[in-house]
A protein has these predicted regions:
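Short beta-strands and strand-coil junctions in structured, solvent-facing domains, enriched
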Residues: 1, 15-17, 56-61, 78-81, ...
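Extracytoplasmic
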Residues: 3-5, 45-47, 66-70, 83-85, ...
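Surface-exposed loop/interface segments of Gram-negative outer-membrane beta-barrel transport/assembly proteins
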Residues: 5, 80-175, 185, 215-220, ...
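N-terminal periplasmic accessory domains that precede
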Residues: 9-11, 60, 66-90, 170, ...
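Short acidic/polar hinge/loop motifs at secondary-structure boundaries
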Residues: 13-54
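Outer-membrane beta-barrel channels and translocator barrels
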Residues: 44, 188, 199-200, 234-236, ...
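Transmembrane beta-barrel domains of outer membrane proteins
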Residues: 74-76, 194-198, 207, 228-232, ...
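Outer-membrane beta-barrel transmembrane strands
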Residues: 184-199, 209-210, 309-335
């Protein structure tokens, strides 16, 4: 599927996306989607009107680029012969954590019952568990059975039926709530100050805004500062000139990601080392634990390597900093 992005028109000027993406790419979660938006620096407080053009009139005005539709945004302007007005607005939002009750997923006891049946049929042998591409509690079991603790000179786990049973019982009742570990109740705050007014020959609209999302998950956060000044000059009864200056600074943190690829044989999309918090919480067994009893990180096997999601978030991340500055002029002459 080719490019399906609409054409953005803000105050008469066409805004191009930094990166043109297909529909599959837009939904991919790839890193490029975080820098592709043409309007990411536009403060919603500054928007006066939004129109969506989807018919033939869109292409007649804007050409072939408008085949996917046109979104026309008009920003606020100061009004002529009005007193100076200063306003402040704020918005604060808290998002709830996802819950396992909203999904039909196995708890740790149900998962362990399935694991034990598979183990009885020979699916969790020592070779596959220790050296396979992915392995969970049985990787940990065989690793502890075969690794000597340097502090004691003995194996981490004695090779006895009682020790094995105790190890598996701990995992059976772990019932790890990955949503609780990976998601937060941190707020989203949005502040905006606007100034508007005008005299006989000019009008001004100005705004500054600060947006801060402390992160719905432990792996992401974003903050943005915007500034906008729009001056309108009434040079004569027929001629009007407008000068708009916009600036925004964005700082963002996100979990690292590998490009998504399609498996045509299975008809599914795949991604190596996918650490998206929501996908991870949904797809990870609740028999696994994030920490050992001593508070250290507990690792299992993923893509042939020891893996812990918190270690990944500490070391596999994206820090994005963007500065955008725009100056736009417009002249209108009435016949």
């Amino acid at each position: 599927i080719g490019n399906v992005q609409p054409l953005w028109v803000i105050d008469g000027a066409i805004y191009e996306d930094l990166v043109h993406l297909s529909l599959d790419q837009l939904a991919s979660g790839d890193a490029v989607t975080l820098i592709s938006s043409a309007i990411s620096g536009l403060n919603p407080t500054d928007i006066q009107d939004i129109q969506v053009l989807k018919d033939a009139s869109a292409t007649s005005v804007y050409g072939a680029r408008a085949l996917n539709g046109v979104i026309v945004i008009t920003t606020k302007s100061g009004m002529r012969d009005t007193p100076l007005r200063v306003s402040y607005s704020t918005e604060n939002t808290i998002r709830l954590k996802p819950r396992y009750n909203d999904f039909d997923l196995l708890n740790s006891q149900e998962t362990m019952s399935l694991y034990q049946e598979m183990n009885d049929k020979g699916y969790f042998g020592i070779t596959n568990s220790l050296y396979g591409r992915r392995s969970g509690i049985y990787y940990q079991l065989y690793k502890d059975l075969s690794t000597i603790n340097p502090a004691t000179g003995e194996y981490y786990l004695p090779n006895t039926p009682e020790a094995r049973m105790n190890f598996l019982r701990q995992r059976e009742y772990a019932n790890t709530n990955w949503f609780d570990h990976l998601f937060t109740l941190k707020p989203i705050t949005n502040h905006a100050i606007t100034i508007s007014g005008g005299g006989k020959n000019s009008a001004t609209y100005a705004s500054i805004g600060f947006y801060n999302d402390a992160g719905w998950t432990i792996a992401d956060k974003v903050s943005r500062f915007t500034a906008n000044v729009k001056n309108t000059f009434y040079i004569s009864d027929k001629f009007t000139a407008t000068l708009t200056t916009q600036a925004n600074v964005r700082s963002q943190k996100a979990p690292g990601t590998m490009p998504q690829r399609k498996n045509n044989t299975l008809g599914v999309f795949e991604r190596d080392f996918d650490i998206n918090p929501f996908s991870y919480a949904l797809g990870t067994s609740r028999t696994l634990r994030p920490y050992n009893e001593d508070g250290s990180l507990e690792y299992y096997r993923n893509n042939w390597a020891p893996f812990n999601i918190f270690n990944e978030y500490d070391n596999n991340k994206m820090n994005i900093s963007m500065l955008d500055f725009k100056v736009q002029g417009e002249g209108t002459y009435r016949l």
